[in-house]
Structures are given as structure tokens and as C-alpha cells.
A protein has these predicted regions:
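Flexible "stalk/tail and boundary" regions
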Residues: 17, 105-116, 123-124, 129-130
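Conserved blade-register residue in beta-propeller folds
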Residues: 14, 55-57, 106
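Short loop/turn segments immediately following beta-strands, especially the blade-tip
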Residues: 56-64, 109-111
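Conserved beta-strand element within WD40/beta-propeller blades
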Residues: 45, 96-97
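Beta-rich, blade/repeat-based domains predominating
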Residues: 1-12, 21-42, 74-94, 122-134
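Beta-propeller fold detector
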Residues: 23-26, 64-73, 116-119
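Short, structured loop/turn "capping" segments at alpha-beta junctions
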Residues: 19-22, 43, 51-53, 62-67
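Short, solvent-exposed loop/turn segments at conserved positions within beta-propeller repeat blades
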Residues: 2-10, 48-51, 99-100
Length: 134
């Protein structure tokens, strides 16, 4: 994350098992919501100010990323707030916390469509996760 929050000043890095850093994505501002599908073949990624969720083909052996595709543009979808923290459920759907939007949305990764929105009585919704025995 850029400490001055200047657009494009930051990068996303990977720390490998030997402790070496590798730059993976340039020209980002605020990396958020990084998660993988069940087979670790796709990495979902948010650079919050873009209000987009990108899907990168991912090689779990090398850590290499392929060319991204846009899964959803939050602004175009008419969702209030900025995408922040994100997790994935057992069905492969993304759950995205909407900072300044007071909600968590569920996005179908096959269609890129919002299938559910859960509103909260707080504006700064920044993270979501699942817990429990199952």
C-alpha cells in the first residue's frame, strides 16, 4: 500500500518459501481482498480505488500470475462503497466487504453478478470471513 496513497505508487509482492520478495502487480494503490479459488488456479484481487475485482490465472507451484480478467466493476454494478476485504465460500462465490457502503455482497464467480447484499448498521465494513466447525 502506498503510504501517501498516491494512485499507482504501490505494488503487490509475493514472499516465497525462501524468504525472497517478487513483484507481481505494478501500479496499484491499495491492495485488498486477495483470495484464491479451491484449486488455487485463480487469484481474486482488489485494488480498492479501482472499485474492480480482477481474476488472475495463478500457478500455485511458481506463484506466476497470468493476464487478469475483470470479474466485476462495483461502480457499474451500482453498489455503494469501495470493495475492501474479501473471502470465498465453499461454492466458489466471493463475499466482499463494502467500506463506506455498510454491506457485504456475494458475487457469483461464474457470472460476475451480485447475488446477495447484506446490509449492516455500520458504514466502515472492511472484512468478512467464515468460521465454525463446517
Amino acid at each position: 500500500m502506498s503510504t501517501t496513497k498516491q494512485t499507482g505508487d504501490a505494488s503487490l509482492y509475493m514472499l516465497d518459501h525462501e524468504g525472497c520478495l517478487h513483484k507481481k502487480i505494478d501500479h496499484v494503490t491499495n491492495s485488498n481482498g486477495i483470495c484464491w479459488n479451491a484449486t488455487a488456479s485463480l487469484m481474486y484481487y482488489i485494488d480498492t480505488p479501482t472499485k474492480k475485482v480482477l481474476a488472475y490465472p495463478f500457478d500455485n507451484t511458481t506463484g506466476n500470475l497470468g493476464a487478469p480478467t475483470e470479474l466485476i466493476d462495483i461502480e457499474t454494478a451500482g453498489i455503494e462503497g469501495s470493495p475492501d476485504g474479501m473471502t470465498i465460500d465453499v461454492d466458489g462465490n466471493l463475499w466482499i466487504a463494502m467500506c463506506h457502503g455498510g454491506a457485504v455482497i456475494q458475487v457469483d464467480t461464474q457470472t460476475g453478478k451480485v447475488v446477495k447484499k447484506i446490509s449492516f448498521p455500520c458504514v466502515e465494513t472492511t472484512a468478512c470471513t467464515f468460521g465454525g466447525a463446517h
